[in-house]
Design a protein with these regions (language model features):
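Short Lys/Arg-rich amphipathic alpha-helical segments
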Residues: 1-186
Length: 186
């Protein structure tokens, strides 16, 4: 039996994650003989703490060991299992990412535009197709396609005080910005 694919692992591990109201955000497999590694990155509307991650690591390890013992999967001579959250540098690619990061700062870059603009994440539309962006000091007029001023003109947050709606699309590259103070709940 070959080393399992990320798809196979996701199929096997999703019930464990969903039992804790978590989503598997990413599975990373690094094959290197005795030093192979399987990384499982989980997140949820309620962020998992270290105790929950430890419990899930135990459950996932037991499930993978049982599958290997049954001959359904093979991890080779040995592997290291890492169960964690994806971290702040994970791009926001699904509506749930935007919902979970409401009130945080986000750097947004649309394909074809050179620089990213920093906005604060507002409410996600009920149909999860758009998100409200609240201007910050680093915000421009608004991302293209947001219903904001056309022509690429820039304005400071002093000039541009109204939130804009950004349609969620694959052309949007967005990453949460690290903020050392508590974000406001506007």
């Amino acid at each position: 039996m070959a080393f399992p694919s990320t798809r196979q692992l996701e199929d096997v591990l999703s019930p464990i994650a969903h039992a804790q109201q978590l989503d598997i955000e990413h599975i990373k497999i690094t094959r290197a003989g005795k030093k192979s590694q399987v990384g499982v990155y989980l997140d949820g509307d309620q962020r998992p703490g270290s105790d929950m991650l430890e419990q899930l690591s135990q459950q996932i390890g037991e499930e993978l060991d049982a599958r290997e013992e049954a001959g359904e999967m093979s991890f080779g001579p040995g592997y290291t299992l890492e169960v964690s959250t994806p971290g702040l540098d994970m791009p926001l690619t699904h509506p749930r990412h935007w919902r979970r990061n409401r009130h945080r700062l986000v750097a947004i870059q649309l394909s074809g535009q050179g620089t990213a603009e920093v906005w604060r994440i507002g409410a996600l539309a009920d149909d999860e197709t758009a998100v409200v962006l609240v201007p910050t000091k680093q915000s421009g007029v608004g991302p293209a396609g947001s219903g904001a001023k056309k022509g690429g003109g820039q304005a400071s947050a002093k000039t541009r005080r109204t939130p804009v709606a950004l349609e969620l699309a694959p052309t949007v590259h967005a990453v949460v910005e690290i903020e050392f103070s508590q974000p406001p709940h506007a």
